[in-house]
């Protein structure tokens, strides 16, 4: 288990203040392009989500990203769930960039807390994004090398330290075009506990911040980096979750998302494509 210093944690009330501040920023933007949704829980065959590989929604309304058989998580599993409508993250005509906030809750539970793998990520990628490698690649990368053509920004919640591209111990990280994070902080994962996550991107400062709170512990873990999404991402993207379990026997965990909300503003833009034209007939119930 990784040790922590005070700089990696902050109080729960402070986290709420940070969250409220970014919500105010979004509400003050005069914008014709916005996207807002909330899933307090999920529904099987959710019409506004694209499910890839092992991802599904259970009868209890949980977004189960990786495979579970008879209550036991499977190895070598990969699942992703994306918001179906393409999202305009920046405007090529005006040069404007969207600010956004997203929050979600998840549970990672492992039969053996000493052999967890591999993790869960929130990510933005090209509209035609498809699942890539299992295990440490978290389903969003195909190798450990930086590649500008990947056009991916992600926040990872990594439960297994891969020697070639991870820091020691479980960690949160911000990834730009590579599984090697540009910034990480140690993360004191708690087996089977609900984690509440808040991620914000402020376009004017290019500031990407992710916070994770275990409500029962009233502490949080925060990672922050400067990311120019206009330089990294295409104008239109899809976004959502990806998760994997380990390749080696016994290195498994559940990767379950309980709820999800998102809000964005793009000054002068469209922000989101018409749901009618987003290809939802393929995924609708």
From Swiss-Prot:
SUPFAM superfamilies: Concanavalin A-like lectins/glucanases
This protein's UniProt keywords: Calcium, Glycoprotein, Lectin, Manganese, Metal-binding, Signal
Secretion signal, residue range per the UniProt entry: 1-31
A Pfam family recorded for this sequence: Lectin_legB
A molecular function (GO) term: carbohydrate binding
Positions annotated to bind Mn(2+): 156, 158, 166, 171
Tissue expr: Strong expression in seed. Lower levels in the flower, and the bark of the roots. No expression in leaf. The lectin accumulates in the inner bark in autumn.
PROSITE patterns: LECTIN_LEGUME_ALPHA, LECTIN_LEGUME_BETA
Glycosylation sites (chain numbering): 147, 188
Residues involved in Ca(2+) binding: 158, 160, 162, 166
Assembly notes: RPbAI is composed of two polypeptides, A and B, that associate into five different tetrameric isolectins. The A4 combination is the only one devoid of agglutination activity. Isoform B4 displays maximal agglutination activity.
Similarity comment: Belongs to the leguminous lectin family.
Function, as annotated: N-acetyl-D-galactosamine specific lectin. Bark lectins are storage protein that probably maintains stocks of nitrogen during dormant period. Self-aggregatable molecules that can bind their own carbohydrate side chains. They could also play a role in the plant's defense against phytophagous invertebrates or herbivorous higher animals.
Protein name from the UniProt record: Bark agglutinin I polypeptide A
Source organism of the structure: Robinia pseudoacacia
């Amino acid at each position: 288990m990784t040790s922590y210093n005070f700089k990696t944690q902050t109080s729960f009330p402070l986290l709420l203040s940070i969250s409220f501040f970014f919500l105010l920023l979004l509400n003050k933007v005069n914008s014709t392009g916005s996207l807002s949704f909330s899933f307090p829980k999920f529904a099987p065959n959710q019409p506004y989500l694209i499910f890839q590989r092992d991802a599904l929604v259970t009868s209890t309304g949980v977004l189960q990203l990786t495979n579970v058989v008879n209550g036991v998580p499977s190895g070598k599993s990969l699942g992703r769930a994306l918001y179906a409508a393409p999202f305009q993250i920046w405007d090529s005509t005006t040069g404007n960039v969207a600010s956004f906030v997203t929050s979600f809750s998840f549970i990672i539970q492992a039969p053996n807390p000493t052999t967890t793998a591999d993790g869960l990520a929130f990510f933005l990628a090209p509209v035609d994004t498809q699942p890539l490698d299992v295990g440490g690649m978290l389903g969003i990368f195909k190798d450990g090398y930086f590649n500008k053509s990947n056009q991916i920004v992600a926040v990872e919640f990594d439960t297994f330290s891969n020697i070639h591209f991870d820091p020691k111990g479980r960690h949160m990280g911000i990834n730009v075009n590579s599984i090697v994070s540009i910034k990480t902080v140690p993360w004191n994962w708690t087996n089977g506990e609900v984690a509440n996550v808040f991620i914000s991107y402020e376009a004017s400062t290019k500031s990407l911040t992710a916070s994770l709170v275990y409500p029962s512990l009233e502490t949080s873990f925060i990672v922050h980096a400067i990311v120019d999404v206009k330089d990294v991402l295409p104008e239109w993207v899809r976004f959502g979750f990806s998760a994997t379990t380990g390749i080696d026997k016994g290195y498994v965990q559940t990767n379950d998302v309980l709820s999800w909300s998102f809000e964005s503003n793009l000054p002068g833009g469209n922000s989101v494509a018409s749901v009618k034209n987003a290809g939802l007939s393929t995924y609708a119930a």
